Amino acid sequence: MEFFLDTANLEEIRKAKAQGLMDGVTTNPTLLSREGGDWRKQAEAICAEVEGPVSLEVVGESAEEMIREAEDLASFGDNVVIKVPMTNEGLVATESLYRKGVKTNVTLVFSPLQALLAAKAGATYVSPFVGRLDGIAHDGMELIRQIRTIFDNYDFPTKILVASIRHPMHVLDSALIGADVATIPYSVISQLAAHPLTDKGLAAFNADWEKLTK
């Protein structure tokens, strides 16, 4: 299972990279706006820092606008993946970009049928948002199970990229179901190594070592 970092913050990217926990990065307009300054320079810096895929999102509403923006964003680096919204126009753009050999990440997916359409259009990744579904009293992880079943039934090469992850259990459930990628905020990825029994065990070992060396 791959871990992507859901951020536009270079410091977070470097920390996760140093831990060996980052296979790629996903961004969106909101994340880039939080960093301030020139978004183009920030996006280019991220592409230069990250060896794996970097998702950069188009904001146009028509397929023509999305394709035009995608061509610009693709110039930021060979590792750019174009984030496209799950709309009818987005599907047109996805299919066109697929024919041109441009990798895409269809985002804002909330149903298995949306994921199926994205896969048929040639999406490289599909991003179901589990946390947002949980937030409206739906089972976000059930969506991942349904998409996994559909993709396995028909051997779609499209990767399931679990998004809107809000806590470590989302990561665990994604791994158990067999999702290909989880894109994780740094605030969550920094919790994955923690366990109270690990802390308790270390404290006991250290206390015993101090006794031994006195």
Swiss-Prot record:
Gene Ontology annotations for the cellular component aspect, listed alphabetically: cytoplasm
InterPro entries tied to this protein: Aldolase_TIM, TAL/FSA, Transaldolase_3B, Transaldolase_3B/F6P_aldolase, Transaldolase_AS, TSA/FSA_arc/bac
Cellular compartments annotated: Cytoplasm
Main location: cytoplasm
EC number: 2.2.1.2
Pfam family membership, one: TAL_FSA
GO biological process: carbohydrate metabolic process; pentose-phosphate shunt
Top-rank taxon, per record: Bacteria
Membrane-spanning intervals of the chain: none
GO MF annotations in UniProt: aldehyde-lyase activity; transaldolase activity
Pathway assigned to this chain's UniProt record: Carbohydrate degradation; pentose phosphate pathway; D-glyceraldehyde 3-phosphate and beta-D-fructose 6-phosphate from D-ribose 5-phosphate and D-xylulose 5-phosphate (non-oxidative stage): step 2/3
Enzyme class: transferase
Keyword Transferase carried by entry: yes
Statement: the UniProt record of this protein carries the keyword Cytoplasm: yes
Active site per the UniProt annotation: K83 (schiff-base intermediate with substrate)
Catalyses which reaction(s): D-sedoheptulose 7-phosphate + D-glyceraldehyde 3-phosphate = D-erythrose 4-phosphate + beta-D-fructose 6-phosphate
Keywords: Cytoplasm, Pentose shunt, Schiff base, Transferase
Known function: Transaldolase is important for the balance of metabolites in the pentose-phosphate pathway.
HAMAP family in UniProt: Transaldolase_3b
NCBIfam families the record matches: fsa_talC_mipB
Protein family: Belongs to the transaldolase family. Type 3B subfamily.
Record's protein name: Probable transaldolase
Native organism: Maridesulfovibrio salexigens (strain ATCC 14822 / DSM 2638 / NCIMB 8403 / VKM B-1763)
Source organism phylogeny: Bacteria, Pseudomonadati, Thermodesulfobacteriota, Desulfovibrionia, Desulfovibrionales
Gene: tal
